[in-house]
Amino acid sequence: MGSTRKGMLNVLIAAVLWGSSGVCAQYIMEQSRMSSQFLTMIRLLFAGLILVTFSFMHGDKIFSILKNRKDALSLLIFSVVGALTVQLTFLLTIEKSNAATATVLQFLSPTIIVAWFALARRTRPGILVLTAILTSLIGTFLLVTHGNPTSLSISSAALFWGIASAFAAAFYTTWPSRLIAQYGTLPVVGWSMSFGGLILLPFYAKEGTHFAVSGSLILAFFYLVVIGTSLTFSLYLKGAQLIGGPKASILSCAEPLSSALLSLLLLGISFTLPDWLGTLLILSSVILISLDSRRRARAA
């Protein structure tokens, strides 16, 4: 298999697994009555530990970033505002609605990123980016109102946390670029997850005594942490390195689609026509932004 096909396959598998992880998280919270805060803590702690361990075995100098005061502070900010917030707001959105809706709303983050950079740099976006912003707004409108501006099809809390999740994902994507360039992806992301989980530990650790642990829940935990987080992250990184960011972004659109289909098949959650139209419009905005990035790269 050629490197391009292998990269595309890795990203596609990662996207499907990421979509399934949201469904898995919803299953865990529904079956155990576990709070989104406790599940976030467990997910971050174990996934972070796995990634840091894997990074160490890979030969990375995992403690270098902690020895530089400025970079350690930047890592702490990323841990709180990035890793912790993006996971917590995502699970809160699932708690208030469902995995499919949470995944689609979080996919607004690319539009937020390009809009922010256009404002910060005072540059006029190209036609592809402007179209992407417009389609994402229309898609969000359809998803949350079903075309009726006088009412919401999801709760106001779900909408709030979903939009917050998109902003957190935008920060998560852009903030650590300098740290990753200097120290590598696995140490930065692994430590950020670990620190994010540790921050929640004093407040939510006691919740572990409030629910019974069954075999199915343990299996779901394993899938969420090992398959849906650690393995998925590694597959996506490897695939993105082989095919480039723009192509990876387009293929990652399989994530919300897999989440919606698995929610339908496994959890009995159905999407109406406005839901599907809104989802497709938001996904098309990601594709347009990726195409614009590819065009700019060729022109440079």
UniProtKB/Swiss-Prot annotation:
One matching Pfam family: EamA
Superkingdom classification of source: Bacteria
Keyword Cell membrane: yes
Main localization (coarse): membrane
Keywords per UniProt: Cell inner membrane, Cell membrane, Membrane, Repeat, Transmembrane, Transmembrane helix, Transport
A GO CC term assigned to this protein in UniProt: plasma membrane
Transmembrane segments: 8-28, 46-66, 72-92, 100-120, 125-145, 152-172, 185-205, 217-237, 264-284
Keyword Nucleotide-binding belongs to the record: no
Cytoplasmic membrane side: 29-45, 93-99, 146-151, 206-216, 285-300
Membrane topology recorded in Swiss-Prot or TrEMBL: Multi-pass membrane protein
Ranges per topology, Periplasmic: 1-7, 67-71, 121-124, 173-184, 238-263
InterPro entries found in the cross-reference section: AA-Vitamin_Transporters, EamA_dom
Residues annotated as domain EamA: 16-145, 167-291
Subcellular location: Cell inner membrane
SUPFAM superfamilies: Multidrug resistance efflux transporter EmrE
Similarity annotation: Belongs to the EamA transporter family.
Protein name per its UniProtKB record: Uncharacterized inner membrane transporter YicL
Protein species of origin: Salmonella typhimurium (strain LT2 / SGSC1412 / ATCC 700720)
Gene name as annotated: yicL
